[in-house]
């Protein structure tokens, strides 16, 4: 018997071009409409730093007797400072996946899967991880994770104290720019946002003479600053515990200089770019598609 996937699309802010979060009310509604769901998978924080109400969503999901799995790939740092939102691992999620390499001092491709409750079938997880993982693990990567955890155990408090101090100082400075706006969670309208990861630096170009792609290019070509991503209406930078005071200073100076050069424009004249993807109609499940008769076109 094939099991189908049911997708819940996030709230959207069309003005800023940013996707928001998933509300507990929408989760409740979807689970009531789809009684055969066996697990609920949610991304929080998102790439842009949007955090959903994990605690309430966990309560909703558990009322339906299924586990909550949280993709917290961009939130491995949350546990280390009260400056950031609370990790899903502490809010009732049953399984939490974190990528060390995204926001902690660890090599690329290092990640962990936390089993946080008895609702997770440990033996089944081990079996499938054994199927999908390589039979030739990298001891360099595993040593990198050990070194990361050892470093955080010894110096983590001081490292994150300095990091959050420099980050907040930079955010305060960047918030004073007149045209390029540093986005806060409260600025994203109708978003279903419960909290916001302030290590994500979102620079809105709405109402300016540049778009996100051009701002990204200027930062790279003129200032040699490589941002994380460019979208139509904003640029994303991800700050992490390894960032230095000098690095924040360079970014602030660059944004301030660009802000002074560009022009303010009428928002109504901007192209109506939509964040939402087309709502596709599901004709078959992934498993059905894999097993279906196929035809090759040259």
Model feature map: region roles:
Residues 3-187:
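Conserved PLP-enzyme active-site core in the AAT-like
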Residues 172-298:
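Non-catalytic terminal extensions of PLP-dependent enzymes
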